[in-house]
Curated annotation (Swiss-Prot):
Gene Ontology molecular function: oxidoreductase activity
Reactions this protein catalyses: UDP-2-acetamido-2,6-dideoxy-beta-L-arabino-hex-4-ulose + NADH + H(+) = UDP-2-acetamido-2,6-dideoxy-beta-L-talose + NAD(+); UDP-2-acetamido-2,6-dideoxy-beta-L-arabino-hex-4-ulose + NADPH + H(+) = UDP-2-acetamido-2,6-dideoxy-beta-L-talose + NADP(+)
Pathways involved: Bacterial outer membrane biogenesis; LPS O-antigen biosynthesis
Name assigned to this protein: UDP-2-acetamido-2,6-beta-L-arabino-hexul-4-ose reductase
Top-level taxonomy: Bacteria, Pseudomonadati, Pseudomonadota, Gammaproteobacteria, Pseudomonadales
Species of origin: Pseudomonas aeruginosa (strain ATCC 29260 / BCRC 12902 / CIP 102967 / NCIMB 11965 / PA103)
Keyword annotations of the record: NAD, NADP, Oxidoreductase
Length: 372
């Protein structure tokens, strides 16, 4: 399959082309700012689908709106018309097409050229009036406020907010690309106007607050709920703006004669992740909890866990090592300890169901002793 992508070097174009390359069996024919409009008839000569993403939204001169949007689209329509084949065509318009400003008028005129083309030769035309698109490879001070805010906040550059309560509608680049590829695959209806879902609404102030939370998480170690929805998309976008020299950061490390203890990640309501080491023969723990629980995973070395019920005196012992993927849980009301019974340093991953609170640690020293 051969696909023409106009605006292939733009924000949406780069993401789309990356996904098309992953698919395999698709040859991308790129059209960029360096390409000649006069070459369009040759470029589309044998293509099976057209993604028309090229356009102008922040020109140096107002007349460039018309040149880069409506006139370019008209030239593309003429090339398709002269080709004689009903090549399916997808166009990225804008919600600004509903507004009577120079940008909106130029995008609406482009839509009209495409609609006429579809009526004249019967080619499927898919028009997406996109709101603010955000994601990796977007340009600050050009594509969206999200890009600008991410770029600045991650570099400690002040951002400007004129109206913090102003609402903006966002769509994530991966959702845009996934929807576009469904159209190419014939999995969406042959409608003239389509939408990318989901769409997110957020105020400018809330957006900035969320991005600052991402920045501060490196110091607090507390991560937001970045696994789904808008927060996931914003976090991925935020990280895509990291300069290379900021790809890593230090976390607290506490060392003593027993070994080291490192806090890695905290959550608002699902506990925290850490790891610790212990030298041969070293025992850690010797305490119990009323409500706090933990999961231990030995990554390296040999460990002996001992447990004693503080009420009944019942005793239990578990031995495990780094060769086994085995979780050992601590149980409320059972005092417990862990001993390195090997000859090398032991490394253990640890999850606790709550973030450590120095004022209320729910940790009470109590020797485990030995079993009967």
């Amino acid at each position: 399959m051969k696909v023409l992508v106009t605006g292939a070097n733009g924000f949406v174009g780069r993401n789309l082309c990356a996904h098309l390359a992953e698919r395999g069996g698709i040859e991308v024919v790129p059209f960029t700012r360096e390409s000649s409009v006069g070459n369009l008839p040759e470029l589309i000569r044998s293509v099976d689908f057209i993604f028309h993403l090229a356009g102008v939204n922040r020109p140096e001169k107002p007349e460039e709106f018309k040149i880069g949007n409506s006139e370019l689209t008209y030239a593309l329509c003429e090339a398709v018309r002269s080709n004689g084949r009903a090549i399916p065509l997808l166009y990225t318009s804008s919600i600004q097409a509903e507004v009577d400003n120079e940008y909106g008028l130029s995008k609406r005129a482009a839509e009209e050229h495409l609609q006429v083309l579809g009526e004249d030769i019967g080619c499927p035309v898919y028009i997406f009036r996109l709101p603010n698109v955000f994601g990796k490879w977007s340009r600050p001070n050009y594509n969206s406020a999200v890009a600008t805010f991410c770029h600045n906040i991650i570099r400690d550059i002040p951002i400007q907010i004129n109206n913090s309560s102003a609402e903006i509608t966002l769509v994530y680049i991966d959702d845009v690309v996934r929807t576009f590829m469904k159209v190419m695959d014939g999995k969406l209806s042959n409608a003239v106007s389509l939408q990318v879902e989901p769409q997110y609404q957020i105020s400018v102030g809330e957006l900035a607050e969320q991005l600052y939370e991402f920045r501060n998480s490196r110091k607090s170690l507390t991560t937001a709920r970045v696994g789904s929805g808008l927060t996931r998309a914003l976090y991925s976008t935020y990280l895509s703006f990291l300069p290379e020299d900021s790809f890593s950061y230090d976390v607290p490390m506490h060392s003593d004669p027993r070994g080291t203890f490192v806090e890695m990640l905290k959550t608002a309501d699902s506990g925290q992740f850490s790891f610790f080491t212990a030298h041969p023969g070293v025992t850690r723990g010797g305490h119990y909890h009323h409500s706090k629980t933990e999961k231990f995973l030995v990554i390296k070395g040999m460990a002996r866990f001992k447990f004693r019920n503080i009420l009944t005196g019942a005793f239990y012992e578990i031995c495990t090592n780094g060769e086994k993927a085995e979780i050992v849980e601590t149980v409320p009301g059972w005092t417990h300890d862990i001993t390195n019974v090997g000859t090398d340093d032991m490394v253990v991953m640890l999850w606790a169901n709550e973030v450590f609170d120095r004022e209320n640690p729910d940790t009470y020293a109590c020797s485990v002793g030995e079993g009967a």
